[in-house]
Amino acid sequence: MVTAGTGAESLKERFEQEGDTYNSMLLQTLTDRLAEATAEYLHEKVRKEYWGYAPDESLSISDLYKVKYQGIRPAIGYPSLPDQLLNYTLDKLLNMSQIGVRLTENGAMYPTATVSGIYIAHPDSQYFMIGNIDEEQMKDYACRRNLSEAEVKKLLNKNISN
């Protein structure tokens, strides 16, 4: 987990209070990109050094964009892991507050320029997305997560077939 938003949120709020939409949006864009770039850098360090499963990897920027490396880094709240409440489990493991990150009631990370990911190093791993699920699958997920059906419908509304 990385954040580039610590301290930036108060500056962004100041810009907004002053009616400076341009600098507010610019700051948000810069901090978002910085967080994403740092997450990608750490993923590369994991592949090449920390876990060392691809020590000789030498990819161009183009190849990095095309995900030509081994392994994936899916993130909670994105198409492969749409249940943002999983961030609460991640928080129990990582204690996000140590780096100034907290969760909203819906499980979104604040500051918003914060990125998490789950490293999967298997050579055949690929990014994926959860498609539509039917009523039975939704009920099964609610049971497995110990959530009400209403909570799951809210969390996964884009994934539930009508």
Located regions from the model:
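Small-residue-enriched alpha-helical segments and adjacent helix-cap loops
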Residues: 1-126, 155-157
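Charged substrate- and nucleic-acid-binding regions of tRNA-handling and nucleotidyl-transfer enzymes
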Residues: 121-162
